[in-house]
Amino acid sequence: MKKAMRSILVIIACCFVLNSAAQKTIDTIATKVDGFDIPIRIKLPKNTTGKNPVYFFVHGGGWNGGTATSVPPARLSTDANYLANQLGVIYVGLAYRCKGNNATFADAIQDLEASVQWFFENADTYNADLTRIGFGGSSAGSTLAAMMAQKYKNCKLFVGAEGMYNLVEHSEERSTFPSQKARELYGLATEKESKKASAFYNL
């Protein structure tokens, strides 16, 4: 009985190891800013040769979250497995400081730029083709991702879901996000700040 039990445990352990290896998801710290670790999550494609394109994903959440000691985690969207395993895309989840970190939109952009730069510097480790990169995001993350996409000449793709790209002409009658309170808390209270954070005005 004990021998059979040990065999079962060995099989389970092997399955876990193989599954973990197959997933090829890497979690690490890309940079440290003002005492905060900025994490990054990388989903590598399986069974590819040569260099692969890169897709940077910025999570949503209304710029909420974060504490006095940590930022919200880097996350992958539901399409990560398909893009990585079926299309050979390196899928990179980015993190950034939010309102709970007493941060601003400009701080978030700084975090994202630092994380992307870290990935660029480690591109050879992940067999990344930096001539083919794209950005995307959901909701509040899409607003940030749109700004990021405009910063890199090798960006070939932008995918935004339910983002806000013109914060200057925004009104709560059109959309409840971001609320006036959220704008004030995240450094978007003035027209100058809103214009600087609007992809529409940075084309």
Question: What label would you give each PLM region?
Answer:
Residues 22-49:
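N-terminal cap/lid segment of alpha/beta-hydrolase-fold proteins
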Residues 163-164, 168-202:
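Mobile cap/lid helix-loop segments that gate and shape the active-site cleft of serine hydrolases
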Residues 51-62:
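Short beta-strand element of the alpha/beta-hydrolase
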Residues 62-70, 91, 118:
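Serine-hydrolase catalytic-loop signature spanning alpha/beta hydrolases and amidase-signature enzymes
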Residues 69-92:
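Short amphipathic alpha-helix adjacent to the substrate-entry channel of hydrolases
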Residues 114-174:
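Primarily recognizes the serine-hydrolase "nucleophile elbow" in alpha/beta-hydrolase
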Residues 1-24:
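Bacterial Sec-dependent N-terminal signal peptides
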Residues 61, 95-99, 164:
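Short beta-to-alpha linker loops that shape the active-site pocket of alpha/beta-hydrolase fold enzymes
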